[in-house]
Amino acid sequence: MEILNRLTLTDYIVFTSFILYLLFFLSPFLERKRLWTVAVTPLASIIGSGYLVSAPLLYYVLGKYAILGMAGIVILAYLIGGAIRYNIIKAEPILYGSESSKLKALLLDVERFSNLSLAFAYMISIAFYLRLLSSFVFSGFFERNEVYERLLTTGLLLFIGISGFIRRLHFLEFMEKYAVGLKLSIIFSFLTALLYYNYKNFSFAGEVKPFDLHSLEVLGGILLIVQGFETSKYLGEEYTPEERVKSMKLAQWISGFIYVSFMFLITSVFVHNPPKKLDETEIIFLASAVSLVLGYLLRFGPLMSQFSAAVADTIGAGGLIYEETNHRVSSRFGYLITTLVGVALVWSANVFEIIAYASKAFAFYYLLQTIIAWLVSFEKKDRLQFLVFTLLIPVLIFIVLFGKSVE
């Protein structure tokens, strides 16, 4: 009864909106949509708990104009996604066609390097996501224990790998769909609460921060928070090129809306309650000040975020292995191989320290994919795409060399 007496109108708005969003995202209507099934994988990978840490970090760097930084990051990510989508439609027929040419030989070399870079990044990031999930579980419900946290991480990795090996892609998608449905319901109920908060307390009076080279380095690092859209490229064993392209677009539209809306709406909260720390726990603390119910939901949200992101990257890694071995190793074996490497990393390295290398590897992968798109667009005389890719390449070189890892 004491808790009920503490509930405010905002709490009831959060709870009601959460239930309504949950009914929608887990509805048979969405479940029957093939495009939604394909889009869930890149969406799960893009929206980890990164939106929680990117907001205070952007506000710290850009002040009240953080919304412009987030919009720029989302647009840049969409342009990079455009390079990968271009490769799915235009480069893959050259790469995997029967005709030989100098261009094909060059593209195969660049593609191989990019895939190796991505495989390296996936294997670290999957271990990182689940290791972080384990630390959330023990810090939130038990006492922290390094060995028990690694054991839980190992169990989760083996569960995902063995499930994917035995039940294949569609079972992983089934698990992912429910985790993403819960995660999106929490995120959209958070946005609803922030919308109500802004209705009562909107302010654009935050401080203005100087924009310099350090700001650009941090923005480059934050770009890697919205990575994950590339997983659509590696679903070719089950889905057509057109389906993969549409799924990536849909995932980037939804995630872009979430990231930009969240940054815009949370800015007023930061004006009244400046963030003291640059991590996801700070957002959870501030959300608890907005709504008691929201605070509890956000404590649960990161668990779903880390699990679904790990499943999504496992799917991507399995598809990558299938492609890189010229279809000799199926995706189901790829899932098992990926998670076993993850288990080895959990027990042999500190994944919280080596995640920075994964961030650089993701950036390098995007650079190489853009170079492939640049080469193909030049060959096919697609002038507009060639111009866009020409402008993207130096931006990605800067991010590879100078981007600050958010982790």
Curated annotation (Swiss-Prot):
Localization terms from the record: Cell membrane
Coiled-coil positions: none
Residues annotated as transmembrane: 13-30, 40-62, 67-89, 118-140, 147-169, 179-199, 253-271, 281-303, 334-356, 361-378, 385-402
One GO location term (cellular component): plasma membrane
Membrane topology type: Multi-pass membrane protein
Alphabetized UniProt keyword annotations: Cell membrane, Membrane, Transmembrane, Transmembrane helix
Name of the protein in its database record: Uncharacterized protein aq_097
Organism this protein belongs to: Aquifex aeolicus (strain VF5)
